Amino acid sequence: MKRKSILLVLCIGMILTSCESKISLNSTDVKNEKNQKNTTMENPDKGYNLPIDEDKKKEVVNDCEEIMGIVRDIYSEYNGIQEADQNTAEQMMNRMKEIIKQNGNPVIGSDHYSVMDNYQKMEQFLKSAEQEEKGSVILYEADTDGGITRKEYSYDGKEMSVMSTKMIWSEDTEPVLTYISLSKIKEWAYTENGNFCYELCVPEPPE
């Protein structure tokens, strides 16, 4: 079976209203793709900064701390060096990916053209969502600052949402939560070529 690759291109368009992301099985432009699956909220509410259940938040934070723990030694080895050398930062990031992928979940690097490991789970989640089947998938991102970003995509049969969590290291090399947020995905599309694009709900004027 020919191995596929998934690229993540994060385009945060804060011009007025939109925040968009693109995950693709290749680098093909998603425009004019056939057989797209588009989902738009029928009665969109604000859809951003949604409340997070405390038990769920604890679960997510604990998971992030566990992942940070398994890459701590790699970060300690590169700490300070990667800040001045982009190549070194990418080496660190790639080594982190190799460790994180062992849990079986999809993982990418924070550079725009990083290949996603364990892409099959993301692919299955999206195909199931096309069939309006409930499900979720976790995508980890190894960042060049030595931290991680965790994105949990969920589909309830009607709408898709994403819970994003970011952790970095303190000066004492302890994991620090910088943010956790839950937002609905206003619109998404998954094409036959493996391109996954979505637009998050964000504040709109006059908010």
Residue spans of the language-model regions?
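Small-residue packing motifs within transmembrane alpha-helices
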Residues: L7-V9
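Positively charged n-region of N-terminal signal peptides that target proteins for export
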Residues: M1-S5
